[in-house]
Regions:
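C-terminal beta-strand-rich structural cap/linker in extracellular carbohydrate-active enzymes
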Residues: 485-504
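Carbohydrate-binding surface patches
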Residues: 428, 439-477, 488
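Structural preference for beta-strand elements that scaffold enzyme active sites
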Residues: 68-72, 106-108, 158-162, 208-213, ...
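Active-site neighborhood of glycoside hydrolase catalytic domains
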Residues: 190-208, 218-329
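N-terminal catalytic cores of secreted or lumenal carbohydrate-active enzymes
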Residues: 36-209, 230-233, 241
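Conserved, mostly hydrophobic/aromatic
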Residues: 71, 103, 161, 212, ...
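Aromatic/acidic polysaccharide-binding cleft in carbohydrate-active enzymes
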Residues: 318-421, 438-441
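Bacterial Sec-dependent N-terminal signal peptides
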Residues: 1-25
Length: 504
């Protein structure tokens, strides 16, 4: 009798959503990407079972405001798009930016060249030109700017752009080289002016720059490709004394300045402490940028929480992540779900840090990292290249990586890897201005995050990395619905208020 009563109770609670939906105007949509082959496939709520995982959403408990999700505009990606047919070029950009696609809302690009450029270049190569009278972004008008403009035309809601320099022009540096070295003191003001001129030049092209990072990977990259070194003290002083005041003088004070821009972990904590302990400098910093390369599984929650405490109310944005040190696997979905990928640390990490770099499944790493970051105050998450070729380039240093979309220009072929769909589970449904919300979860093996969107909808992303299926009962307010999530699968559940559906 007790077992019968329990089953009847489960049946009632799991189908309450339908009955209440008719009364309150709420509905539920479920989308799934899985190792078994689903790719953002829309599903129906499932039948209940005994022993379900229970997740209670707590919309009244709010955390950071979401800035967005997306990828990066690089010269390599832009060049490849230009090698494809018009139809395939449009297909890719629509997949990333249109209302029917992933709806990317936060992006990044490079100031001057980076390793994912066709070669090394800067906007002013005239040595000693302190007033930057020869400054020009003409190089970017060949590939990069056309790609951004096309994306703008396809994006209904628009998107933000963060711009990052890998290096100043060599003539501004103490080693007169694209790689390594430091900014010479006599060129600090010229370098600040360089940022301002870049922002204004892009605005003249119809492209607003929302934010800047002061330097991509200021700790360096072993001088392999474009880089310039900063200590946290030097970055703090440069922003306080030069970059911040320059942008303010030029009426660009609304542009968000993000500090650090390298890996999470102990270094992040040291940088956050130094950058934000100086009140005058902190007034110019809008937040912190981080990368994911310090580990293939650890998102360093303690470091993210520490950074949040050091800079409450300011941004923490993951500005770069990718499957590095791997040539892309062409039309092999299974590989992206398999624990076969290695990263730079697999071979090159110091012995005491090797444990942070085991082999991993790319989809797992993406989902785990984004969920972990969101649950620890990160408000934006940006992937690296949007498009690469079958070699993992073009990259002038041969630093091959994988992107969510891989192309073969010679055959005019396009491959949307499972990473594209993984990104879309977040970018398409958790919108700018959303608030991350609290939840209770009875199964720690089931990863999830949840957010309340500005239109009143609730988005919940579930990730089941395990080998067994799960049935999950999701409840909020007086509503409850069930979803069956298979092993090795991601689901987004969208609770939508019918009266607001026209806003999507």
């Amino acid at each position: 009798m007790y077992k019968t009563r329990t089953i009847l109770y489960i049946l009632f609670t799991c189908f309450t959503m339908t009955a209440l939906g008719q009364h309150t105007g709420h509905s539920v949509q479920i989308f799934e990407t899985s190792a078994s082959g689903n790719k953002l496939k829309q599903l129906s709520p499932s039948a209940p079972v005994t022993g379900m995982v229970r997740v209670r959403l707590k919309p009244a408990e709010t955390f950071q405001t979401i800035t967005g999700f997306g990828g990066s505009f690089t010269e390599s990606s832009a060049y490849l798009l230009g090698q494809l047919s018009t139809n395939n070029r449009k297909k890719i950009l629509e997949a990333y930016f249109s209302a029917e696609g992933a709806r990317y809302s936060l992006t990044r690009t490079h100031i001057n060249s980076c390793d994912f450029s066709l070669g090394q270049y800067a906007y002013d190569t005239v040595a000693g030109d302190t007033k930057l009278e020869h400054f020009s972004i003409a190089h970017d008008t060949i590939h990069l700017i056309p790609m951004i403009r096309e994306a703008q035309q396809l994006s209904k809601d628009g998107f933000k752009i963060i711009a990052s320099p890998w290096t100043a022009p060599p003539w501004m540096k103490d080693n007169n080289d694209w790689r390594g070295g430091k900014l010479l003191p006599q060129y600090r003001q010229s370098w600040a002016l360089y940022f301002s001129k870049y922002i204004q030049a892009y605005r003249q092209e119809g492209i607003p720059i929302w934010g800047l990072t002061v330097e991509n990977e200021p700790l360096g990259n072993d001088n392999n490709w474009e880089s310039m070194h900063f200590t946290p003290e030097a970055m703090r002083d440069f922003v306080r004394d030069h970059l911040g005041p320059q942008l303010r003088r030029d009426g660009l004070q609304e542009v968000v300045i993000l500090g650090y821009d390298q890996n999470r972990g102990e270094e992040l904590e040291r940088w956050a402490r130094i950058l934000f302990s100086d009140a005058a400098a902190a007034a110019y910093f809008g937040g912190t940028a981080v990368h994911w390369y310090a580990s293939t599984y650890d998102y360093f929650p303690a470091s993210l929480q520490y950074t949040h405490r050091q800079s409450p109310g300011k941004h923490i944005i993951n500005t770069e992540a990718c499957v590095d040190a791997e040539v892309p696997k062409w039309e092999d979905d299974n590989w992206y779900w398999s624990k076969e990928a290695t990263d730079w640390g697999w071979d090159w990490a110091p012995p005491d840090q090797k444990y942070l770099h085991p082999k991993y499944a790319p989809v797992f790493r993406y989902a785990n990292d984004i969920i972990g970051c969101l649950n620890n105050y990160v408000d934006g998450w940006i992937d690296w290249n949007m498009v690469l070729d079958k070699q993992g380039g073009p990259n002038w240093f041969r630093n091959w990586c994988t992107a969510p979309v891989i192309v073969d220009p010679e055959k005019d072929a396009v491959y949307f890897t499972p990473l594209y769909y993984t990104m879309a589970h977040f970018s398409k449904f958790i919108r700018p201005g959303a608030k991350r919300i609290g939840f209770e979860n009875t199964d720690t093996a089931l990863q999830l995050t949840a957010a309340s969107n500005p239109d009143g909808s609730l988005a919940v992303v579930l990730f089941n990395p395990g080998e067994t299926d799960k049935t999950v009962a999701l409840s909020w307010e007086e509503q409850e619905t069930c979803t069956h999530i298979p092993a090795k699968a991601i689901q987004t559940i969208l609770f939508t208020n019918a009266k607001n559906q026209h806003n999507d």
